[in-house]
């Protein structure tokens, strides 16, 4: 269990003390009169910005130029119309989630219509039975249907899809790591198809990057969702590599309504089984090698990162199948005996026993302090049920404070075995506010509001799904806490833009681009 409390870094934060510092005096005695006048005039007028601010800031404070302004790119590739929402705006997040759900349903239905026969041949007819049951339930209740059998078939079918996806990704990673001369013809074709997709993605990203303003946080956008879907899927389970409708694992699950049937029959919410993305790692690799060819080993690392997320979902499903369903069946039989009901239906009382509170779902949960809510907010990030892990990430942007802490797991109906380690969310939140209150940088009014906020529970503002593995999510959070350079890039602009940048860096990661500047040459020509 770890805990980190740090002060956030911003551009210009130390400029106020720069002229009187010992480091500044040393700099003044060495850089010459012209540069000295340049520094004083620019700082005095508060006109330092962009590269000028970054370069001069590094000189007058003695810090490395690595902390100066570069181009920061949030590592998500977006379809048209999608934006990172403000974490403190539930309405904004809700509309975006509903639009995405409608788009996914339309795309998944196209996959079912196009590949239905091939999918049934590969994954057997159980998928079709589950889908027919879903449609039957939508039209009229089929009371004599053996609902627990349908539930079992839905879980089994989902397990087959995840197993196949796991296998295909491991195959691709293995083939990418092989020497070119050692690959068979089939392996060479597979690697070439994947490289073609990466090249398409690379070209699109390069076009967007060329159009981006320097020294700005940006999301790389511009490709349609369908093309992105094809380009980001390493090995489609069924269908051509760059087809318009690709039969990915997520598309097959969505087309045959597996998660919806499992939720309708058992009350177990599997919406956290999102589309495990490798796009952040792929985009990071493409940006790193933008001027040269990407080596196969670097691509293999991206595939293995996605593999980690697939295995996380697979372990979760096996936890549901092996641990939860037997308990569910036992509770169902007990309820039928009490009710003296011989029908093959699952009683709603049984479902309610396996419902868990929304605030304990495996998602990123957003809270804010009751007062000064725009500046004081935090994320409670929860892992899959089988892992029973979570962490706290709190921000006070008015005094530039960040607090990270690993927390104890929640005890609920579908969690794994409990371990007595870590503190609760309430304890972490109160310590976070106590530390913010004790800081001397805040105004008197801000301190009063924090004291008032400490006496009540924080405001719950909803939750978001994350599309990467929990370990990668934790890695992104820790990078926000530790990486001063990253902090300086995401903490710029209007306050709502800073919150979006923080959420983007948490969900997707952030890569800082740009080459180091020749500082002596810069000052010589200033």
From Swiss-Prot:
Tagged with keyword Magnesium: no
One of the record's GO molecular function terms: structural molecule activity
Entry keyword annotation includes Transmembrane helix: no
Annotated segments matching region Involved in membrane permeabilization: 1-42
UniProt keywords, alphabetically: Capsid protein, Outer capsid protein, Viral penetration into host cytoplasm, Viral penetration via permeabilization of host membrane, Virion, Virus entry into host cell
Subcellular location field: Virion
GO CC terms, sorted: viral outer capsid
GO biological process, one term: symbiont entry into host cell via permeabilization of host membrane
Cysteines engaged in disulfide bonds, as pairs: none
Pfam family, one: Orbi_VP5
Main location: virion
Matching InterPro entries: Capsid_VP5_Orbivir (IPR000145)
Stated role: VP5 protein is one of the two proteins (with VP2) which constitute the virus particle outer capsid. Acts as a membrane permeabilization protein that mediates release of viral particles from endosomal compartments into the cytoplasm. Permeabilization activity is probably negatively regulated by VP2 and is triggered by endosomal degradation of VP2 and exposure to low pH.
Protein family according to the UniProt entry: Belongs to the orbivirus VP5 family.
Identification of the protein by name: Outer capsid protein VP5
Species whose genome carries this gene: Bluetongue virus 1 (isolate South Africa) (BTV 1)
Gene behind the chain: Segment-6
């Amino acid at each position: 269990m770890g805990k980190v409390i740090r002060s956030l870094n911003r551009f210009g934060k130390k400029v106020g003390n720069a002229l009187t510092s010992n480091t500044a005096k040393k700099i003044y005695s060495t850089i010459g009169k012209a540069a000295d006048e340049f520094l004083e005039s620019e700082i005095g007028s508060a006109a330092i910005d962009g590269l000028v601010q970054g370069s001069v800031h590094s000189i007058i404070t003695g810090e490395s130029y690595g902390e100066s302004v570069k181009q920061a790119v949030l590592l998500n590739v977006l379809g048209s119309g999608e934006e990172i929402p403000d974490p403190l705006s539930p309405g904004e997040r809700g509309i975006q989630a509903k639009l995405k759900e409608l788009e996914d349903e339309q795309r998944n239905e196209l996959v079912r219509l196009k590949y239905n026969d091939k999918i049934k041949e590969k994954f057997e007819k159980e998928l079709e039975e589950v889908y027919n049951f879903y449609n039957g339930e939508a039209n009229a209740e089929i009371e004599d249907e053996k609902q627990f059998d349908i539930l079992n078939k839905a879980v089994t079918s989902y397990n087959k899809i995840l197993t196949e996806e796991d296998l295909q990704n491991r195959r691709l990673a293995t083939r990418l790591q092989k020497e070119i001369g050692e690959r068979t013809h089939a392996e060479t074709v597979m690697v070439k198809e994947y490289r073609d997709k990466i090249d398409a993605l690379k070209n699109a990203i390069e076009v967007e990057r060329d159009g981006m303003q320097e020294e700005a946080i940006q999301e790389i956008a511009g490709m349609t969702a369908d093309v992105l879907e094809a380009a980001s899927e390493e090995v489609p389970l069924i269908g051509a590599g760059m087809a318009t409708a690709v039969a990915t694992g997520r598309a097959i699950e969505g087309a045959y309504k597996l998660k919806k049937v499992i939720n309708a029959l058992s009350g177990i919410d599997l919406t956290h089984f999102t589309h495990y993305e490798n796009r952040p790692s792929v985009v990071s690799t493409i940006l790193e090698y933008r001027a040269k060819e990407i080596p196969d080993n670097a691509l293999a690392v991206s595939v293995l990162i996605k593999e980690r997320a697939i295995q996380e979902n697979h372990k979760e499903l096996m936890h549901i199948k092996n641990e939860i369903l037997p308990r569910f069946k036992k509770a169902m039989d007990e309820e039928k005996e009490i009710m003296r009901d011989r029908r093959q239906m699952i009683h709603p009382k049984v479902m309610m026993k396996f419902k868990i509170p929304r605030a304990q779902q495996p998602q990123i949960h957003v809270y804010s302090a009751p007062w000064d809510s725009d500046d004081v907010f935090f994320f409670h990030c929860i892992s899959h049920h089988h892992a029973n892990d979570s962490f706290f990430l709190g921000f006070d942007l008015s005094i530039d404070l960040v607090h990270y802490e690993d927390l104890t797991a929640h005890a609920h109906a579908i969690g794994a075995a409990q371990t007595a380690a870590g503190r609760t969310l309430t304890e972490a939140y109160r310590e976070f506010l106590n530390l913010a209150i004790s800081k001397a940088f805040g105004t008197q009014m801000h301190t009063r509001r924090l004291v008032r906020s400490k006496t009540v529970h924080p405001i719950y503002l909803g939750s978001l799904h994350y599309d990467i593995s929990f370990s990668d999510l934790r890695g992104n959070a820790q990078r926000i806490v530790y990486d001063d350079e990253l902090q300086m890039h995401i903490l710029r602009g209007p306050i709502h833009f800073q919150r979006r940048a923080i959420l983007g860096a948490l969900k997707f990661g952030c890569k800082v681009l740009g080459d180091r500047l020749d500082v002596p040459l810069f000052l010589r020509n200033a």
